[in-house]
C-alpha cells in the first residue's frame, strides 16, 4: 500500500485539513453505507473508508502513516520478530487499556454516550449602514436534523436498536496484525455497528438508519451595532443534530460588511473625503457634510490647506465594546480647475499681480485653441 491510498479512499489530498477529512469521511461513509447502498462491493468500500478515517483522523497515526505507510499507522514499537504476539495480558488487568491508549484505541470510550452535533458556518453580507446601526436578519440553510420519524434512533418505528452481536456494545474490534515491525495489536471501528455499539435490524425508512435527515432551517440573527468584517456571532444549538441523544452543534454567523460609496471605516471612526474649490479654501465657507446620521453643517476656516482633517464628534459608529459613539473625520482636498473661462483667467491673473507673484505670461490662445474650447463647451 502506498502512502496516499487512505487519502484516495476519502477523495482528499495529502495536505487536507482535519475538517476536510471529516467532511469527506461523512460524505463517503453515507455513500457506501450498507443500509443505503445495496450495490455489490459497497460494504467493502465502506470498510475501507472506515479504516482510512480511523488513521487519518488521529494526528499521531496520520504522521506515522505519512512516513511509513499502513504498517507505521498500525504500530510504533520496534521489537523482535515476535513483538507482542500471543500475549493476551492475562493477569495484568489494565494492560489492554494501557496498550490501547498507545494506539488510539480509546478503551474507555463509550460509543453510546451522547455526542454533540457538528458546528456550521454561515456568511452574512451587511450594508455599511446595517453594520453601523445593527440589524436583525433571518438566515436560511440546510442542516442535519434529528429524524422526525424515528426520533434519532435510526430504527423503524415500533422497533429498537439491539446490542451489536460482534463487538458486544463496545463499538470497536481488537485486531492482531503481522507487520514488518512484528505482531501489532490495534483497535478498529466495528464493521457491523460502525462504532455505535448498537445494531439496527430494521432501519428507519426515512433516514435509512442514520438517525438524521437533511432539513431546511431558518433562524433569526440579531446583529449588534458597530460590528465589522470577520466578526462572528455564535448561535447555540443551531448547528447539526447530535448523536445518541446529544445536543445540536452551534451555528457561527460570519459577518462581511460591504463597502460604502461615500465612507470608509476603522472601528468606530468613519472617514469622509471632501472636495472644495481653492476659493472656498482661501476665503472660508460653510458646507453640508453627509454622515450616517444625516447631513450636518461644517465650517471651513479661511486659509484651509489640502489634507486638513476636521472632526465631527459623535458622528461615527457605535463602539462595540465599552459603549459610546465614535467620530467622523473629514479630510479636505482642494480641487484645481482644469478649464478656465476668460473672466476666471483674468481674475486669477489680477489676484496673482495683487499678491506680487512673478509669473510667466501664459501663451495666448490662437484661433484653433478657441475653436477647440468652443467644441468642448457644446
UniProtKB/Swiss-Prot annotation:
It is found in: Cytoplasm. Coiled coil: none annotated. Residues 5-69 form the J domain. GO terms for biological process: chaperone cofactor-dependent protein refolding; DNA replication; protein refolding; response to heat. A zinc finger (CR-type) spans 134-216. Pfam families: DnaJ (PF00226), DnaJ_C (PF01556), DnaJ_CXXCXGXG (PF00684). One of its GO terms (cellular component) is cytoplasm. One of its GO terms (molecular function) is zinc ion binding. It comes from the Bacteria. Zn(2+) 1 binds at residues 147, 150, 204, 207. Its cofactor is Zn(2+). Gene3D superfamilies: DnaJ domain, Heat shock protein DnaJ, cysteine-rich domain, Urease metallochaperone UreE, N-terminal domain. CXXCXGXG motif repeats lie at residues 147-154, 164-171, 190-197, 204-211. Zn(2+) 2 binds at residues 164, 167, 190, 193. Keywords: Chaperone, Cytoplasm, DNA replication, Metal-binding, Repeat, Stress response, Zinc, Zinc-finger. Participates actively in the response to hyperosmotic and heat shock by preventing the aggregation of stress-denatured proteins and by disaggregating proteins, also in an autonomous, DnaK-independent fashion. Unfolded proteins bind initially to DnaJ; upon interaction with the DnaJ-bound protein, DnaK hydrolyzes its bound ATP, resulting in the formation of a stable complex. GrpE releases ADP from DnaK; ATP binding to DnaK triggers the release of the substrate protein, thus completing the reaction cycle. Belongs to the DnaJ family. The J domain is necessary and sufficient to stimulate DnaK ATPase activity. Zinc center 1 plays an important role in the autonomous, DnaK-independent chaperone activity of DnaJ. Zinc center 2 is essential for interaction with DnaK and for DnaJ activity. Homodimer. This is Chaperone protein DnaJ.
